[in-house]
């Protein structure tokens, strides 16, 4: 695929598939390594002991099943198997076996953490993984092309809706419209409160920054009308998510959302084809 910014272009399906497989594997791999690193906190004496969390499950049979699954040695084995499946995704591509295992194991991990360990990144991880699952099962019952089309559109609709809703919610909140919310959030960042002379303590600058985010998020669906717009949108989104990582330490937030970008660019290209 050659890029000519003066002419509309499309992202080929094989390239979009390969990019998403590799980006998702990187994203989920980082998450899995984090879980392995946190094993001491998940044992019986740890902060996230299963003995406490199991009380959220009322069904005795389900409790017994998860007691076995979330035993330290078994859960560790599950995480290593998850890394192996992600490696196979990079080396051999998506197939019914590795994607289904990754989806089911991801649900188990979410149950272990009461639904979401890291908020939005877990949501987007599940969205991309669900898209991959759709691609394989639709491909199994129908055909591969239809499966990947359904995958990309599912991920894109979920992603664009998330951006738009986030912007719309900010638009309705007075603290975002007047810029104070940005200062409040940054004061709670990992680098500590903004110092007294920091530029973002100036009301006009924090208001400008807030409105920039609001307008960008609300305009997200417009990126689908041209592949070039989609690429620019994804570049801006990558910068935004990197800043979230930089200020708040949410590293998996960056990779989880970047993994959805190939689907967005691909879908924009399909709209270009339909419009031509």
Question: Residues of each region from the PLM?
Answer:
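Alpha-helical membrane-anchoring segments
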Residues: 1-276
């Amino acid at each position: 695929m050659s890029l000519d910014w003066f002419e509309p272009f499309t992202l080929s399906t094989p390239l979009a598939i390969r990019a998403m497989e590799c980006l998702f594997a990187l994203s989920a791999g980082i998450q899995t390594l984090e879980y392995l690193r946190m094993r001491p906190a998940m044992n019986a004496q740890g902060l996230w002991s299963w003995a406490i969390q199991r009380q959220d499950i009322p069904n005795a049979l389900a409790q017994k099943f998860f007691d076995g699954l979330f035993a330290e040695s078994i859960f560790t084995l599950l995480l290593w198997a998850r890394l192996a499946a992600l490696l196979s995704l990079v080396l051999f591509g998506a197939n019914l076996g590795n994607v289904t295992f990754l989806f089911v194991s991801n649900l188990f991990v979410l149950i272990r953490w009461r639904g979401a360990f890291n908020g939005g990144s877990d949501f987007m991880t599940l969205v991309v993984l669900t898209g991959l699952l759709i691609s394989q099962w639709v491909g199994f019952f129908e055909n591969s092309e239809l499966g990947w089309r359904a995958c990309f559109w599912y991920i894109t609709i979920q992603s664009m809706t998330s951006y738009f809703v986030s912007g719309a919610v900010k638009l309705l909140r007075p603290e975002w419209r007047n810029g104070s919310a940005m200062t409040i959030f940054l004061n709670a960042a990992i680098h500590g409160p903004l110092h007294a002379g920091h530029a973002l303590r100036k009301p006009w600058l924090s208001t400008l920054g807030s409105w920039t985010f609001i307008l960008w998020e609300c305009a997200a669906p417009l990126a689908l009308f041209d592949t070039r717009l989609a690429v620019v949108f994804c570049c801006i989104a990558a910068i935004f998510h990197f800043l979230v990582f930089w200020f708040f330490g949410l590293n998996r937030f960056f990779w989880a959302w970047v993994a959805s970008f190939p689907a967005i660019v691909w879908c924009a290209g399909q709209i270009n084809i339909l419009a031509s």
